[in-house]
Amino acid sequence: MIQGFATPEGTASFASKAMAHKENFRKIQNLTLSNIGIGTYLGNPDLETDNQQKTAIKQSILEGVNVIDTAINYRAQKSERTIGKAVSELIEEGKINRDQIFVSTKNGYVTNDGDIPEDFMQYIMREFGKKGIVKEGDISSQYNCITLPFLEDQLARSQKNLGLDCIDLMYLHNAVEGQPQMSHDEFIHHLSDIFEFFEKQRKEQNIKFYGLATWECFRVSSDKPNYLSLSEIIELAKKIGGDNHGFRFVQLPYNLSFDQAFMQKNQLADSNNQITFLEAAIHHNIGVFTSVPLMQGKLLEWIKNNEKFTNQSPSVDALQFIRSTPGVLAPLIGHKLESHVSENLQVLKIPPYTEQEFYDLFKKLTG
């Protein structure tokens, strides 16, 4: 197990030595984090993908990315293991220190193990059912489970997979979307217990921060049953953990097609005024990481044929727009092929848009 966690001193040192443009780092919770992160969602659970992903992670870190995101169910635990190998190799090679990089993962979805050739349900019964970790009714129709025994088991597995004794950020993974049968009040009751669990894990230095990784709940209108209020969640965190609570980050989809976080006024600023999710995140100092920046490649052709963008590559244009959006900490880009990694990381060589440049482009796109 690699000891330690991301620190203000370590992340600042990483930024000062990075090949990336100096404006491509942002301060949050006293940490200096790159405004591009590595995502590890896509890919088969096989050795070829392991090797591609490991090489991509190492190349990304060496070129100035110190945010790495995964989830225990990504590639059936193999993405976590690949990150662990990449990080440990870079540390052994003397190229980074543990305190320079920020690693996030997610727990909540039930997954098998890509390294064990066993039927999915047989694995679940053997690993969780027979051991009493999950019981009948715990797992939703979406294969999501948010009971404390399950989350405790998953945290320990994530630590082992990553080879890290402390995970910088642990997300509860798509809990609203993964528990469609649960009422709002019932969900908040469960979330209260989970936040207590996370605060305990912080005290034991198993995690530094916690957050919610989401798909729809922060992007839908407030009249929808799966809507969540950010201020309500923050108040819950304060009630459980006090002013120094660990709920400091959210992940949600945001790109040139999924623009709700920036456009839709669905959060309350006060009793009279509604603001967007990203405005609410700025107000509460919540770090927002964004997923699906390229819509798994579907946006690239549209960008390529849109003369309103610069002459950068389509992926750089997409990443530049997202990371320059006020309130966004960093988009998480999943890449494995060396050519894609090199192309995407060109964005690190240029500064993000100024706020004026961003709004000028936004007006062109929406005009």
What is the predicted role of each segment?
Residues 39-52, 136-152, 180-185, 304-312:
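Active-site mouth loops of central-metabolism enzymes
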Residues 115-149, 316:
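Active-site-adjacent "subsite" loops/lids of carbohydrate-active enzymes
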Residues 38, 101-103, 158, 167, ...:
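Structural signal for hydrophobic
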Residues 144, 150, 157-160, 164-165, ...:
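Fungal eukaryote-biased detector of long internal structured cores
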Residues 1-126, 165, 182-185, 189, ...:
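N-terminal binding-site loop/beta-alpha segment at the start of enzyme catalytic domains
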